Amino acid sequence: MLNTLPTDLCANTPSITIRDNRGFAIIALTYNRTNTHQAPEQLINRNHYNALSLLAASRDPRLEVDNFRYQYSLSGVPLRTDSVDGGSTLQLADSAGRTVLTRDAHHSRRWVEYETGEHSLGRPLSYREQANGGLKTVTDRFFYGENSEQDKGCNLNGTCVRHYDSAGLQALISQSIIGIPLQQQRRLLTDTKGPVDWFGEKENWGTRLSESPFVSHSTTNALGQLITQTDAKGHIQRMAYNRAGQLIGSWLTVKNGVEQPIVYSLTYSAAGQKLREESGNGVITEYRYEPQTQRLIAIKTTRPAKKDRPTLLQDLRYDYDPVGNILAIHNDAEATRFYRNQKIVPETTYRYDALYQLIEATGREADTNGIQNSQLPTLASLNDSNQFVNYTRHYHYDRAGNLLKIQHTGASQYSTHITVSDSSNHGIQQQDGITARDIRSQFDAAGNQRQLQPGQPLRWNSRNQLQQVEPVPRNDGISDSENYLYDGSGSRVVKISLHKTHNAIQTRSVIYLAGLELRSQYNGNNLTEDFQVMTVGAAGRAQVRVLHWESGQPADIVNDQLRYSFDNHLGSALIELDSDGDIISQEEYYPFGGTAVLASRNTVEAKYKTIRYSGKERDATGLYYYGYRYYIPWLGRWLSADPAGTIDGLNLYRMVRNNPVRWSDSNGLLTEEQISMYVNMLSYIGLKNDDELKSELLNYGLSEEEQDQIYLNMPMFTQSGSSSSSATSLSENSSSSGSTRSIDSGYISPIKNYHFFEDINLATMHRPYPIEKVSSEEIMYAAAELKENSHIEVLIGLDLTSKNLQSYKSALADEGIDYITKGKYEIEDFFNEGGLSTEQIDITVNKILKLQESAIVGVHCGAGNGRSGIIASALAINKLYATNEVSSFNVTHPLGGTMPGNKDTYQVDIVTASAVGIIRKTNPQAVERNEDVSALYDYSYLLYTRQHSTSL
């Protein structure tokens, strides 16, 4: 559902890119304002490129110095990066391009040792690290499957089978033929406090590891999807899928128990979006989407009828502006209330500036709420949860996107001020006596915050991972603290909390394993509680956690309690239900993550809720753990600099571009939308692995540094949970799809995504040559395959050329196909921001019309849908104007895009929609983007004006 958009706010606030004579974007201009009475403020981002055409420096609109500076070797390999937020890093590579030495801002060094020898594969053998002024230690050792009968029987040849890392030993016992782990073993360090050192012979390392390993087992189907997963304590999860590979059911068997359903059924739309989900407790969740944009517009959750309880649990409705910002969320399951002379409507509303940063939010909160800080608000009983008041929040930012002030009006009136450095984006909550110049001392050289609150020190390890927080430091004894241990991939595997009481030290520990958390509590040396939390990760939208006590079970909770958590569009846990569908807890959130409403049926059960905002775990410190970083919800910023660099912008502390209502972050690197965008781009341009992506990104003008930040740091390009050393490229795991014929990894069939449109006598297809250099035999085969299957006589290349172009052109000529690949027919895609101009479209269409007088013509682009779809649609537009045959191809839904501003847009719209209908009739994936449609509108209007009085 669309709501009213203040279009005047965005008037005269364009985004402008200025390029140098080499085509590089050197200046990006944006304009912003928060209300229509303000004049737009100009914001200037600058890039500088060196003589090698490599990005040398970037600067944001706020600072007078460069945010980032880059230095390269003579061959263009990145050597050094200087960041005002994250400090200086140095990396050196060997002659094969492999990183052999890195040095971070602390001057901590890491050396990588690789296999050597004539027949070696060049795999990493060890990591050696040395903190500044410390001793050199071996932090990681890698051992690979040999050519033994046992390794061959378990599909382990050449695979990393034992990884000694910073948490202990991770061993792979067996894997499927397509590389999916089937049996794994984890042994943790017995001493989690001291530095790890795997120096010497591995026979001597066993004493440093726990005696009892944690072993997990899995079974998979032919697609590599999990069918069963048996965790380290013997609990079994089972999953089922439909023919499309979508989850349709899941079950859980607690050890020595009876299998019970977690998800009864799931149904999906044709677009793959979830429509209906029935949980094991009988609760049904239904989803609705806006037809044109496929945006989520409603989530409705109901439970089975039962005496003295309502069946409707939540009924969320979403209002959007035309670009996708959420303007309001209504919960029709809640009643409007009146309290303290206020009308309390169960809805939240949002307002944005011209850059789509959130500047105002309204909603409801508990009347007992005070100033938001690291503590949760007062817990209310479910029976007393009706005492709400309205709140309004205003958010203020600087020119670089730093959140400076949160102004709150509601149960309490207060403002949270954030002091930001005048030389970086470092920032902390305002303190007496701390000025912008003093902020530098509050962060270490790598951009890690030194204190959570005044007097609460933070300690970081040599890999810039948070190692310890001391909420209550003591000089004369053991401090209250929370300590963390990470494995070689950077994932947290152990959390230990120490709390001093009058009589003893209370210790709480959590061990994180696949699908399982092992939690325990000690008072001194006495074990007071020991329980396991099974996390059902494939349970649809309703995430389920099962609590199983071995000892110390609380009186108010049944053993093996199922807790179904129902969330919103961000994944934030709103309602917890038990196996009978009764409410355990309810929670509502402010934007940026604070808790506005918190209620539970009893205080004991409330203590065991750990997953909250955005589906992430909230620690006792008040921080949220995202994976790569920790998040400060009461300040709306990250605790440390983004380890992925500028992948989410020059400000390394900004949270989801200051639009936390629309976007979420899955792992502390970048927004979910960006991850989806890159994955879709990979698929859209017809690439199947990260090597091809890197080559293609070069065509889009991205520097090698930017390419590395995209394809090396993103989790979808490595196996989940694997270390950086044993991460597997998609090129090693992915099989080809469609009509791709695997001569070798570089070959792409020229008839992939081939379509012939009889109405316009034109063929479109995927790029008919590989990106990487391949053999002449493969090029000849591809040319023959195209000739045999398409019968085209002329082929026009619409995308940029590659190193195979001339060889392929000659091969096509031998097959009698003329390949036109130069001049104005090489058209830049909309990924390059410029897009297809009306002139380019007009020239190309006229060329095709001329060629069609004597030949069968085809066109190609990266994937055969974008540029090819535009040119095919434009050719259809041209022929519709020439023949006046419109109505038979008319489509009944709007296309999107931007119409030209003139009085004849109705006629132009009919012709454009009819033409796109012709193309989509054969290729439904063509012309999917609004930018493509806008280009076609402009071309259609050009033809309309030429005909002047054309009658439609």
Whereabouts are the PLM-identified features?
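Hydrophobic, small-residue-rich alpha-helical packing segments that form membrane-like cores
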Residues: 39, 44, 48-52, 64-75, ...
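Cysteine-based protein phosphatase catalytic domain of the PTP/DSP
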Residues: 745-753, 757-856, 873, 877-937, ...
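Acidic/glycine-rich beta-solenoid
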Residues: 35, 63-68, 72, 78, ...
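A motif-centric feature for acidic-aromatic and gly/ser/thr-rich catalytic loops and repeats
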Residues: 554-627
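Carboxylate/His-rich catalytic cores and anion/metal-binding grooves
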Residues: 27, 37-40, 44-59, 172-183, ...
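Low-complexity, glycine/serine/proline-rich disordered segments
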Residues: 667-744, 949-952
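Short turn/helix-capping motifs enriched in Asx and small/polar residues
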Residues: 581-599, 607, 622-623, 628-629, ...
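Thioester-forming pentapeptide GCGEQ
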Residues: 1-45, 50-51, 213-215, 222-225
